[in-house]
């Protein structure tokens, strides 16, 4: 069982590494767009913000199965800590969960704040069709 989990983890790490250049390029594009804005009044709200920051949308990514050791537990622990901080500050919280493990844990306490759950339990291979849902 550990060998299977290790092989799947290695495959997932390789996929994540292949996506890193794309992520870095997207980060550069957003930084260039936001730095080129001189007038905050005419800029799109996505880039300039509204200044209110009252509503926070948090996307919690966990697995659908439990073969990840402490991965899911650590993600959920960090998420709950962050949610508690937002609640303490009086912020409104909306949650999207990706993966059934996170949804199962968070719906007990934050069920009314979860606006969507995306799960890939029935898919063997992730592809664009499934990623498009996210």
List each language-model region with its residue ranges.
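Conserved loop-to-helix interface motifs that mediate assembly, gating, or partner/ligand docking
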Residues: 1-134
């Amino acid at each position: 069982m550990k060998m299977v989990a290790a092989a799947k983890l290695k495959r997932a790490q390789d996929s994540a590494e292949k996506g890193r250049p794309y992520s870095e390029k997207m980060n550069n594009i957003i930084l260039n767009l936001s730095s080129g804005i001189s007038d905050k009044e005419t800029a799109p709200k996505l880039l300039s913000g509204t200044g209110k920051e009252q509503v926070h949308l948090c996307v919690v990514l966990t697995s659908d199965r439990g073969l990840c050791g402490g991965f899911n537990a650590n993600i959920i622990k960090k998420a709950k800590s962050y949610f508690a901080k937002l609640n303490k500050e009086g912020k409104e919280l909306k949650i999207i969960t990706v993966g059934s493990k996170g949804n199962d844990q968070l719906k007990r306490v934050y069920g009314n704040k979860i606006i969507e759950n995306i799960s890939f339990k029935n898919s063997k291979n992730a592809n664009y069709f499934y990623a498009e849902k996210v």
